[in-house]
């Protein structure tokens, strides 16, 4: 019976025992993870038929391998059934203990994530409150204390000022200050002339003046008095500068210099402005029509010159009228206006520079139209003529008042040409005298040469030695001069000054290049 009973127990009548693998798979965390993995695998498998066929092949392979492994491991499992049972019981007890210690294993992943999020947010909120609340409370306390202190100090100061003003000494001090300020205002009104704006008020303000006004405070009265004094000071300085300018204009020589400076400044400004308006890279447009308008531009430039002169005269008249009138802006306003004009001219010159460079490039490449070239050339010639006139006047004045030696041009090496190359007649006579061997009865006179040419030198100083020119002719020998032996003429040492100039009448001072040109022409 015992054997039969054991056989029946082995056949399956044993009570069912818990399996560790089943319990682990039944845990909400593991089951949820498995479901998520299964959904991902299914969606990936359904994405493409090729992927589905590959996955099915792998599934069949895994199933066949698992069935083969179970069939091969079955004898081993039967022999080690007791050991597997003991290990299963031990694992179940450990799983029970783990579930007691970690209750989160009994909840799904969504719930665990939400609870974890709430826990983290509450912890962060509590940490932030623990830091910010003390700081906010402390700052509120500090600001409240500072505000209370300021209000207390302001109240104390106001009460003190009111108390001091209500005392006898305060009343006396305020009355004295009021009296002194009133006396100063009366003195200023008596000494200083009233302004036109204040003396002639608008009719709309007359009714407002009739209405009673509150007495201005001491500070406002002091400010008005200071404003009046400063305005009068500026006006006085402007009048003094104007009178000094008028007195300086009476000095001889100042008026021409000032007018010349004003004219130069106006010409320069007009040249810059006209150049800015004209230079717009004109050589990029209308290249063929430029040559046909040359004659018209010449006439136009003459008309423009007359118009420019008229504009200059009108501008000078306006400038003189403005200078004669008292400046309403005063000294500071004039300085500011001058600085503004200077800044504007600087900016205009800077902006005009690129266009000027492009125009210059066009002129170099012969692409600039004739109108622009002719007008620019005309203005440049007018400016050069004006400068030349000024220099001529200065030179004439210096020559008139300063004694200078009169200078004229002298032909270089003209005096010593006959020494190096004597005439043929002189050589013949010298040869006959030497052949005869007889001493000369008297000194043989040197051949008298003709006067030098008069094309470049009108007269010659009596002390200078005569020198033959290009057109000189050999004259007949003169009467013998007793007492002068016939000595061959020696070539004196040449000086640098002899090759360039000789004192004579007032003639232009020229160099070697100019002299060579004049010599070729003669």
Curated annotation (Swiss-Prot):
Chain positions with Phosphothreonine modification: 85, 299, 301
Bias-annotated ranges (Acidic residues): 291-314
Chief localisation class: endoplasmic reticulum
Disulfide-bond pairs as recorded: none
Keyword presence, Endoplasmic reticulum: yes
Region Disordered, residue ranges: 195-217, 287-318, 413-522
Keyword check for Signal: no
Residues bearing PTM Phosphoserine: 81, 126, 130, 132, 137, 174, 382, 384, 408, 436, 497, 499
InterPro entries in alphabetical order: Perilipin, PLIN1
Keywords: Endoplasmic reticulum, Lipid droplet, Lipid metabolism, Phosphoprotein
Tissues in which the UniProt entry reports expression: Detected in adipocytes from white adipose tissue (at protein level). Detected in visceral adipose tissue and mammary gland.
UniProt feature, compositional bias: Basic and acidic residues: 414-435
PTM remark: Major cAMP-dependent protein kinase-substrate in adipocytes, also dephosphorylated by PP1. When phosphorylated, may be maximally sensitive to HSL and when unphosphorylated, may play a role in the inhibition of lipolysis, by acting as a barrier in lipid droplet.
Listed GO CC annotations: cytosol; endoplasmic reticulum; lipid droplet
A Pfam family matched in the record: Perilipin
Family classification: Belongs to the perilipin family.
Disease: Lipodystrophy, familial partial, 4: A form of lipodystrophy characterized by loss of subcutaneous adipose tissue primarily affecting the lower limbs, insulin-resistant diabetes mellitus, hypertriglyceridemia, and hypertension.
Designated name of the protein: Perilipin-1
Species in which this protein is naturally found: Homo sapiens
Organism lineage: Eukaryota, Metazoa, Chordata, Craniata, Vertebrata
């Amino acid at each position: 019976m015992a054997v039969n009973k054991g056989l029946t127990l082995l056949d399956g009548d044993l009570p069912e025992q818990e399996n560790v693998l089943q319990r682990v798979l039944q845990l909400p965390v593991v089951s949820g993870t498995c479901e998520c993995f299964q959904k991902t695998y299914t969606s990936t498998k359904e994405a493409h038929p090729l992927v589905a066929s590959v996955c099915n092949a792998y599934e069949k392979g895994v199933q066949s391998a698992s069935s083969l492994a179970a069939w091969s491991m079955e004898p081993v499992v039967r022999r080690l059934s007791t050991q597997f049972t003991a290990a299963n019981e031990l694992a179940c007890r450990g799983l029970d203990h783990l579930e007691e210690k970690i209750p989160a294993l009994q909840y799904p992943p969504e719930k665990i994530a939400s609870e974890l999020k709430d826990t983290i947010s509450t912890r962060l909120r509590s940490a932030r409150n623990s830091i910010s609340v003390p700081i906010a409370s402390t700052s509120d306390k500090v600001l409240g204390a500072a505000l209370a202190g300021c209000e207390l100090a302001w109240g104390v100061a106001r009460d003190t000022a009111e108390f001091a003003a209500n005392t006898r000494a305060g009343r006396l001090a305020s009355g004295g200050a009021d009296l002194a300020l009133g006396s100063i205002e009366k003195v200023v009104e008596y000494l200083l002339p009233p302004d036109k704006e204040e003396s002639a008020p608008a009719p709309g303000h007359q009714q407002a003046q009739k209405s009673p006004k509150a007495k201005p405070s001491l500070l406002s009265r002091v400010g008005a008095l200071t404003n009046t004094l400063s305005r009068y000071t500026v006006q006085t300085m402007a009048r003094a500068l104007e009178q000094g300018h008028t007195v300086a204009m009476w000095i001889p020589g100042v008026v021409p210099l000032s007018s010349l400076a004003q004219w130069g400044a106006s010409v320069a400004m007009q040249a810059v402005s006209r150049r800015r308006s004209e230079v717009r890279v004109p050589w990029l447009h209308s290249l063929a029509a430029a040559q046909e308008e040359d004659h018209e531009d010449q006439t136009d430039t003459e008309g423009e010159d007359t118009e420019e002169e008229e504009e200059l005269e009108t501008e000078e008249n306006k400038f003189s009228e403005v200078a004669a009138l008292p400046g309403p802006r005063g000294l500071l306003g004039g300085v500011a206006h001058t600085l503004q004009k200077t800044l504007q001219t600087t900016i205009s010159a800077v902006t005009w520079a690129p266009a000027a460079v492009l125009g210059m490039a066009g002129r170099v490449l012969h692409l600039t139209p004739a109108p622009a070239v002719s007008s620019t050339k005309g203005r440049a010639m007018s400016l050069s003529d004006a400068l030349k006139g000024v220099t001529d006047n200065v030179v004439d004045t210096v020559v008139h008042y300063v004694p200078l030696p009169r200078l004229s041009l002298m032909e270089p090496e003209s005096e010593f040409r006959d020494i190096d190359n004597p005439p043929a007649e002189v050589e013949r006579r010298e040869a006959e005298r030497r052949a005869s061997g007889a001493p000369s009865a008297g000194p043989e006179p040197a051949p008298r040469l003709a006067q030098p040419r008069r094309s470049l030198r009108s007269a010659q100083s009596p002390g200078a030695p005569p020198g033959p020119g290009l057109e000189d002719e050999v004259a007949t020998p003169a009467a013998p001069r007793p007492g002068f032996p016939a000595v061959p003429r020696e070539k004196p040492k040449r000086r640098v000054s002899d090759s360039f100039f000789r004192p004579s009448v007032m003639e232009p001072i020229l160099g070697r290049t100019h002299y060579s040109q004049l010599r070729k022409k003669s």
